[in-house]
């Protein structure tokens, strides 16, 4: 509880920073001669319990294929890299040639720091308030230039090393960089404070935005619907948001029949799922798949 309060207090600083910019995350493409360009991009979202990936047609801005691999059960002695190697054997499209390759690290080891308060020499200090850090940890950051802030996080170094062996060069970033950037863009010209909750397996993120300002970001572990509801209501109370009034939008692995949705709906008046119709127009996958894989499909 103490760490939660500290994290919430830290983000009161963020409230004072004006993020009134069109927040577009700039990416650097791999060097490709125009005559060799294939107009193909591969994005792989990685976690310790599996991976998902999709292929993009960059000429038409569409998603051409998508697959998901779960590491349901495996022996403790099994290396994560071996499980990824098996996935590469099972899915030949992972070995095809691409103009761009993006690796997306999905974990709850991240935070956001406004540019005026950011110093890349002290990355670990930003994370120590909401996660346990060690001297041996490797820290990285994603610059979100047009939002004047940075995502600070701990990537999966062993997984990055595996991809170096597979691809040689690639770009990587944190999943929450993509998530928050998209939510800030969507909040443009909306003066209302909105809470968005992104549900992952075992953890979820709470993001509060208002007209391209990031008012709060925090990540929580959970095991029950009651855990889920408690953190939402506690965060709302800290920010002075009235459960009878503020809009709560849910995204990720959730639908209206979920017990998590039903419990939130019981205590918060304005609950809905994030609208993914614009994203769905760029692919042939279902609304539920677009909601679950919102970050990957927006990469």
For every predicted segment, state its role.
Residues 4-299:
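Hydrophobic/aromatic-enriched cytosolic interaction surfaces used to assemble or bind macromolecules
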């Amino acid at each position: 509880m103490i760490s939660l309060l500290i994290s919430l207090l830290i983000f009161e600083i963020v409230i004072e920073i004006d993020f009134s910019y069109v927040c577009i995350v700039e990416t650097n493409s791999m060097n490709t001669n125009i005559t060799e360009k294939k107009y193909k991009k591969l994005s792989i979202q990685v976690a310790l319990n599996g991976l998902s990936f999709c292929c993009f047609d960059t000429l038409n801005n569409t998603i051409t294929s998508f697959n998901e691999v779960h590491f349901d059960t495996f022996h403790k002695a099994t290396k994560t890299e071996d499980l990824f190697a098996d996935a590469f054997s099972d899915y030949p499209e992972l070995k095809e040639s691409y103009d761009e390759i993006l690796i997306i690290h999905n974990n709850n080891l991240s935070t956001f720091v406004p540019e005026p308060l950011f110093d890349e020499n002290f990355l670990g200090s930003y994370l120590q308030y909401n996660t346990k850090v060690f001297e041996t940890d490797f820290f990285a950051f994603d610059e979100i230039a047009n939002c004047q802030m940075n995502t600070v996080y701990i990537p999966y170094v062993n997984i990055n090393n595996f991809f170096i062996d597979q691809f040689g060069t690639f770009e990587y970033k944190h999943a929450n960089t993509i998530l928050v950037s998209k939510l800030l863009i969507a909040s443009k010209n909306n003066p209302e404070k909105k809470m968005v909750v992104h549900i992952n397996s075992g953890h979820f993120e709470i993001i509060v935005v208002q007209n391209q300002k990031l008012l709060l970001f925090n990540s929580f572990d959970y095991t029950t619907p009651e855990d889920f509801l408690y953190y939402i209501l506690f965060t709302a109370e800290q920010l002075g948001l009235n459960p009878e009034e503020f809009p709560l939008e849910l995204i990720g692995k959730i639908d209206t029949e979920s017990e998590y949705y039903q419990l939130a709906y019981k205590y918060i008046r304005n609950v809905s799922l994030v609208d993914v119709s614009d994203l769905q127009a760029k692919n042939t996958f279902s609304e539920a798949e677009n909601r679950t894989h919102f970050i990957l499909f927006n990469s």
